[in-house]
Amino acid sequence: MNQYFTYILQCSDKTLYCGYTTDLEKRLATHNSGKGAKYTKTRLPVKLLASVDFDNKNDAMSCEWWFKHKLVRKQKLSLIKNDLIKEKFIEYLELKQKKNIHLK
């Protein structure tokens, strides 16, 4: 079974980048080689701030989307600083699952 990671990088200009992958070390190296995401290419080097592993791709992608679209920078930095990323991702997935059950 594959393992998936949602990861958060800090770019050289102090901005944050969030993505998902199956190989965290390789993806970080790809970003830092300038062959990663378009966003990070001009903001090298990047540094890994946090990562959370998941058993399935959908959960990793959902948490990436939530981090990018539902949190403001201050919230993102607070979760990272207080080591609450995994806890909040799990809460988000549980809430998402409850909503899906009620919609069916």
UniProtKB/Swiss-Prot annotation:
Q: Which domain of life is it from?
A: Bacteria
One Pfam family hit:
GIY-YIG
Give disulfide pairs as residue numbers. none
Domain GIY-YIG, by residue range, is 2-79
Signal peptide location: none
Q: Which family does it belong to?
A: Belongs to the UPF0213 family.
Kindly provide the name given to this protein in its UniProt entry.
UPF0213 protein YsiG
Q: What is the protein's species of origin?
A: Lactococcus lactis subsp. lactis (strain IL1403) (Streptococcus lactis)
